[in-house]
Design a protein with these regions (language model features):
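Conserved small/polar residues in nucleotide/adenosyl-binding loops
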Residues: 131-138
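Conserved beta-strand hairpin/beta-sheet module of binuclear metal-dependent hydrolase folds
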Residues: 3-64
Length: 145
């Protein structure tokens, strides 16, 4: 049974809650459980932000399919490759081979190693483009004397 949360009109939380695992990353106690967050943007194109840990994969895939409502999944944005963000990426790409993976070069190497030997669609992004700040030369900030 699906369990999703509406964040905005076109953004849904489709992750899952794990109340069984005693430790996060085998090191940090989580006596009340933990949440694996994944979000789906439903716009002209559909964009999935991260997958989840295998502990909640059944719930995640039920949530995803319900939220998509028969629409195709266009993009999967991979923030980084730790299991709480990407453990079910390989299974996702089997279910949705039409999706283009959006990631950086380091993540792509790990995807090829751990999940998909040859992802069909990949859009590489430069880490620097994702984390830029305005600078004085952009004209958005005053120049310092």
């Amino acid at each position: 049974m699906y369990c999703i949360r509406k964040v905005t009109d076109d953004l849904l939380w489709i992750g899952g809650n794990d109340r069984q695992s005693p430790l996060f990353e085998s090191a940090h106690p989580v006596p009340r459980g933990m949440s694996y967050n994944s979000y789906l943007l439903l716009d002209e194109k559909t964009v999935l932000f991260d997958t989840v840990d295998r502990a909640v994969q059944t719930q995640f895939f039920e949530n995803l399919e319900h939220a998509l409502g028969g629409r195709r999944l266009d993009y999967v944005f991979v923030h980084h490759m730790e299991p709480d963000h990407a453990a079910t990426l390989g299974d996702l790409m089997i279910r949705h081979p039409e999706a283009t993976i959006v990631c950086n070069g380091k993540s792509l190497n790990m995807i090829r190693q751990f999940h998909c030997t040859d992802p069909k669609g990949v859009l590489l992004v430069n880490d620097c483009l994702l984390y830029t700040s305005p600078s004085p030369r952009d004209g958005l900030l005053p120049r310092m004397p």
